[in-house]
């Protein structure tokens, strides 16, 4: 846990999933503190919109203003709810919207934590363009190293005149005034043909590797299991290309597409609808934190290309949680397949959780591993 003192309230904040005590990661950063400083003496009139509040630092600090927390991460929503409870703040003080929803009209203040991907930032700025006014105070923040010329140009292009502050504690802010500059329409998704198939893959703004098939998924697809039956999971599904291939290779199976990103799940659904509509009755789509809340002993197989970062931080906490949930939700003799960078050494992590692990395939960068749920472990 970490403490954040600001002009609104003193907070105790925790990351979600929690990090270990040996290598703790903080649940807020200097950019959060810097953003809150700008509002200390500001009268807030109209709705407060907070975008990409990773662990709820801004939402908790501004809870008395009933802010809207907008983002594309269900884990961030869970983190914010947990930190509201931790600080004795009514959860209903914050209204949660995902990035595909319509934003509230005429906000008084918009606070943006600059996301990792420029595509998501552009989608969010275009959504803001429809609701902000010239009186809306628009402030964005990030580590100074993550604010580039292209970031500032995007604010200018979509919203209007933009300036940046001096760095403070290695953080920098962006101030923007809306004046409705001319702007061409942009498609909701980016699409590309998947080689070796007649499929067109559609990707919303925040989907990993949205402009083409990433090399890890490409390697994984060469080693996917065939002729499985029952329910199988594409965990951390992204655009659903793994699950789509599983539907094709396993005609007797049902595939459950799971991701914490609403945009990823929307992309997966769109890709099944447009490429294998006949398989929709064998498909389920779920926005979730891994397999949290899913009944145990349900699935025959889980397939996963786990992330090794959360927001801007490198961490295996999310992957570790995925593996534990996968084991809980697999049937006896159910199988977990993963692809990962070789340097992450997931072989020993899986062996610790499952008691076994087999290398299916490897190249100079990636490894495909399989672990089997052999029975109950203490």
Curated annotation (Swiss-Prot):
Q: Which GO terms describe its molecular function?
A: 23S rRNA (guanine(1835)-N(2))-methyltransferase activity; nucleic acid binding
**UniProt catalytic activity:** guanosine(1835) in 23S rRNA + S-adenosyl-L-methionine = N(2)-methylguanosine(1835) in 23S rRNA + S-adenosyl-L-homocysteine + H(+)
**Entries under InterPro entries matching the protein:** DNA_methylase_N6_adenine_CS, rRNA_m2G-MeTrfase_RlmG, RsmC/RlmG, SAM-dependent_MTases_sf, Small_mtfrase_dom
What's an example GO cellular component term for this entry?
cytoplasm
Broadest EC class assigned to this enzyme: transferase
Q: Which UniProt keywords apply?
A: Cytoplasm, Methyltransferase, rRNA processing, S-adenosyl-L-methionine, Transferase
Q: What is its main location?
A: cytoplasm
User: Coiled-coil region(s) at which residues?
Assistant: none
Cellular compartment(s): Cytoplasm
Family as reported in the entry's similarity comment? Belongs to the methyltransferase superfamily. RlmG family.
Q: What does this protein do?
A: Specifically methylates the guanine in position 1835 (m2G1835) of 23S rRNA.
Protein name per the record: Ribosomal RNA large subunit methyltransferase G
Q: Which organism is it from?
A: Shigella flexneri
């Amino acid at each position: 846990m970490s403490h954040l003192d600001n002009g609104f309230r003193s907070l105790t904040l925790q990351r979600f999933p929690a990090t270990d005590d040996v290598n703790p990661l903080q649940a807020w950063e200097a950019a959060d503190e810097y953003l809150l400083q700008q509002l200390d003496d500001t009268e807030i009139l109209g709705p407060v919109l907070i975008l990409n509040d990773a662990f709820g630092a801004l939402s908790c600090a501004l809870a008395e203003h009933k802010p809207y927390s907008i983002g594309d991460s269900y884990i961030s929503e869970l983190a914010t709810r947990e930190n509201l409870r931790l600080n004795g703040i009514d959860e209903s003080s914050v209204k949660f919207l995902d990035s595909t929803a319509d934003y509230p009209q005429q906000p008084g203040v918009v606070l943006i934590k600059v996301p990792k991907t420029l595509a998501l930032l552009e989608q969010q700025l275009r959504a803001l363009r429809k609701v902000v006014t010239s009186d809306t105070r628009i402030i964005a923040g990030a580590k100074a190293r993550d604010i580039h010329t292209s970031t500032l140009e995007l604010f200018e292009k979509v919203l209007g005149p933009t300036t940046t502050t001096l760095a403070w504690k290695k953080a920098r802010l962006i101030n923007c005034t809306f004046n409705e500059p001319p702007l061409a329409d942009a498609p909701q998704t980016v699409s590309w043909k998947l080689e070796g198939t007649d499929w067109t893959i559609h990707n919303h703004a925040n989907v990993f590797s949205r402009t083409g098939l990433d090399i890890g998924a490409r390697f994984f697809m060469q080693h996917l299991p065939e002729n499985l039956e029952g329910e199988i999971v594409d965990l951390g599904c992204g655009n659903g290309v793994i699950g789509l291939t599983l539907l094709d290779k396993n005609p007797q199976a049902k595939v459950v597409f799971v991701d914490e990103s609403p945009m990823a799940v929307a992309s997966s659904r769109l890709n099944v609808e447009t490429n294998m509509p006949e398989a929709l009755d064998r498909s389920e789509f779920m926005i979730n934190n891994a397999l949290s809340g899913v009944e145990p002993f349900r699935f025959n197989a889980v397939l996963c290309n786990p992330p090794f970062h959360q927001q801007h931080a490198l961490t295996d906490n999310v992957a570790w949680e995925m593996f534990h949930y996968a084991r809980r939700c697999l049937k006896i003799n159910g199988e977990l397949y993963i692809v990962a960078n070789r340097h992450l050494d997931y072989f020993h992590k899986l062996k610790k959780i499952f008691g076994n692990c087999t290398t299916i395939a490897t190249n100079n960068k990636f490894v495909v591993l399989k672990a089997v749920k052999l029975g109950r472990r203490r």
